[in-house]
From Swiss-Prot:
The gene is 65. It comes from the Viruses. The keyword Acetylation does not apply. GO terms for molecular function: ATP binding; ATP hydrolysis activity; DNA helicase activity. GO terms for biological process: DNA replication. This is Gene 65 protein. Transmembrane segments: none annotated. The keyword Nucleotide-binding applies. It holds the Pfam family DnaB_C.
Length: 268
């Protein structure tokens, strides 16, 4: 048990914000913080994986990325495109031919990110990867990404409800953030009516209604007018440390060029 003053000294890095990447999110008071659990939810093809990967690459914080949903070829192609501005077609061709230009390869080498590509990692495999990271770097990463949480094997036996295991997984990831001091980001799906991904998604749109535990929940929707870049809108529908709007109607807008995987502030 700790007094309030003792809590000040034992918190470690918990609560420290990770570097902002997009001013639009920063101005909304949406900050990823160490020691906390964040859920990023969107329909298929909206760009949630691109959004989180772009954050990890551009923030340049030490990251352990559990890429269950995408293989090494896909993630490397995306990373090359994000960092170089190349089209995804050019990036995938360069990766396939193992012919990445030196300047791009050097920029990849500068990013302190490590990937785990287990398609259905168990909790033991996640813990082993974290232990290996700690043994290698003598510290835990600032950011841990689980993409996505439905791929994690929880071996839950709580009846026939497929989301009972996700609720316990949220508790597990929450505790992971507390114990490691890492910001843990989980990617997740939304309910059927919101799968089109072209309208604001409220807190109630999260698949399985597992929003009890995370400190922050972001929902993404994407709007295209058929000309120029798309608009990737980020709604902060839950935020224990700041402003939120559970309806999803208040959002930060980012410019998203899908062909080159570029996500930027408008007018950057």
């Amino acid at each position: 048990m700790y007094t309030p003053r003792q809590s000040l000294y034992i918190r470690g890095s918990a609560g420290d914000p990770l570097p902002p990447v997009w001013a639009a999110l920063d101005q909304k008071g949406t900050h990823l913080r160490r020691g906390q659990l964040v859920l990023v939810c969107a329909g298929p093809g909206t760009g949630k994986s691109a959004f989180v990967l772009a954050y990890a690459l551009k923030s340049k914080v030490p990251t352990l990325y559990f890429s269950a949903d995408s293989d090494a070829f896909t993630q490397l192609s995306r990373s090359v495109s994000i960092l170089s501005g190349w089209s995804l077609e050019r990036a995938t061709r360069a990766v396939r031919e193992q012919n990445i230009e030196d300047a791009v390869a050097d920029s990849l080498d500068e990013i302190p990110i490590r990937f785990n590509y287990k398609a259905s990692p168990s909790l033991d495999e996640i813990e082993n990867a974290l232990a290996a990271y700690d043994a290698l770097y003598e510290d835990f990463p600032a950011l841990i990404v689980v993409d996505n949480i439905t791929n994690v094997r929880t071996d839950s036996s709580e009846g026939d409800d497929p989301f009972s295991g996700l609720e316990s997984l949220m508790d597990y990831l929450h505790e992971m953030g507390r114990e490691t001091g890492s910001c843990v980001v989980g990617l997740h799906h939304v309910t059927g009516p919101h799968n089109d991904g072209d309208k604001p998604i409220p807190l109630s749109g999260i698949k399985g209604q597992i929003g009890r535990v995370p400190e922050m929940i972001l929902t993404l929707h994407r709007v295209s007018d058929g000309f120029g870049p798309d608009m990737l809108n980020v709604s902060t529908v839950k935020n224990r440390g700041g402003k939120s709007d559970p309806s999803g109607q208040d959002f930060a807008s980012l410019e998203f060029v899908g062909d080159t995987m570029q996500i930027n502030d408008f007018g950057h």
